[in-house]
Amino acid sequence: MDSQIKHAVVVKVMGRTGSRGQVTQVRVKFTDSDRFIMRNVKGPVREGDVLTLLESEREARRLR
């Protein structure tokens, strides 16, 4: 694997997505930089949680 593991803090929970609402879309801020991206998270998540991202370049599409 070429990419490094990155840690990101959940800044805002945007909403639920997926066919049955099993995925939560969140806005995260990387701890090592000032970058913000949107990610889809499976499982319980709330603001302030720290996520370990194996793939840090992939960004989720916006909710409709």
From Swiss-Prot:
GO terms for cellular component: cytosolic ribosome; cytosolic small ribosomal subunit; plastid. CDD domains: S1_S28E. GO terms for molecular function: mRNA binding; structural constituent of ribosome. The keyword Ribonucleoprotein applies. It is found in: Cytoplasm. Keywords: Cytoplasm, Ribonucleoprotein, Ribosomal protein. PANTHER family: 40S RIBOSOMAL PROTEIN S28, SMALL RIBOSOMAL SUBUNIT PROTEIN ES28. HAMAP family: Ribosomal_eS28 (MF_00292). This is Small ribosomal subunit protein eS28x. The gene is RPS28C.
